[in-house]
Swiss-Prot record:
Family matches, as HAMAP family: DapD
PANTHER family: 2,3,4,5-TETRAHYDROPYRIDINE-2,6-DICARBOXYLATE N-ACETYLTRANSFERASE, ACETYLTRANSFERASE
Binding site for substrate: 106, 143
Record protein name field: 2,3,4,5-tetrahydropyridine-2,6-dicarboxylate N-succinyltransferase
């Protein structure tokens, strides 16, 4: 019931956001928006969630709250062995050693997580960037120089390799975030953007780029997918010919994940201890 009230308040603030120039209106809105940010930060709510039938739903009101966070906060000096000037704090501001032990998060020097992003237990964060509203599920590693965009959803026991870009989406506000389901391996320097869903157990090879309009071709069946990689697919970069014989980039499903693939891409539990 309380969450429904918060949702209703956020939607009302969003409709009347032009009034936020009024200080008292802005002050009242800030109290509500900070409640949403706190719920996001703790993982009690998330921008997108998977239903029992495998479909994902996007909670637009939460995305609206994140956008309103930028409207209701003032930029301030932020000291982290160097100065920044931003509206959003680091998630780990004020944390002590005990809090890190309790959360079972390993945050390597150079990682930066903005407040409102959720990070689950046994997650390893190498020097990387996690943007607002993102959700990183338990047992996942975000490797060096990877960027997780706003509201992106990363599943359990995933490995997001070095230099990977996972697209964010706060504009346009109704667009769906990128979703990486459980037990996926995203190869180095790959890019997934524009609301694409990588289904459970899939493996993307190094340098695979997938957006909403990217052709994803199953080599065995010649079936073409857009915006979604089927479960347990092994995907590599490739090319296909257009109607006028011009070579166009595509992603190719070369096979389904087998035991050999699992051995090559399995996560190392020692690194998460």
């Amino acid at each position: 019931m309380q969450l429904e009230k918060i949702q209703s308040d956020v939607e009302d603030i969003w409709k009347n956001r032009s009034k936020l120039s009024n200080r008292s209106v802005k002050r009242a809105a800030r109290v509500i928006i900070k409640k949403v940010i706190k719920l996001l930060d703790s993982g009690k709510i998330r921008v997108a969630e998977r239903l029992s039938d495998g479909k994902w739903i996007v909670h637009t009101w939460i995305k609206q709250a994140i956008s309103l966070y930028f409207l209701t906060e003032e930029s301030k000096m932020i000291d982290h062995t160097g100065w920044w000037f931003d509206k959003v704090n680091n998630k780990f501001d004020g944390w002590n050693e005990e809090e890190f032990h309790q959360s079972k998060i390993r945050a390597v020097p150079g990682c930066f997580v903005r407040q409102s992003a959720y990070v689950g237990t046994n997650v390893v964060l190498m020097p990387s960037f996690i943007n607002v509203g993102a959700y990183i599920s338990s047992g996942t590693m975000i490797d060096t120089w990877s960027t997780i965009g706003s509201c992106a959803q990363i599943g359990k026991n995933c490995h997001v390799s070095g230099g990977v870009g996972i697209g964010g989406v706060l504009e346009p506000i109704q667009a769906s975030p990128v979703i990486i389901e459980d037990n996926c391996f995203i190869g180095a320097r790959s890019e997934v953007a524009e609301g694409v869903i990588i289904r459970e157990g899939s493996v993307l090879g190094m340098g695979v780029f997938i957006g909403a309009s990217t052709k994803i071709i199953d080599r065995e069946t010649n079936k073409v997918f857009y915006g979604e990689v089927p479960p347990y697919s092994v995907v590599v970069p490739g090319s296909t010919l257009s109607a006028n014989n011009i070579s166009i980039y595509c992603a190719i499903i070369v096979k389904k994940v087998d035991e050999k693939t699992r051995q090559k891409t399995s996560i190392n539990e020692i690194l998460r201890d």
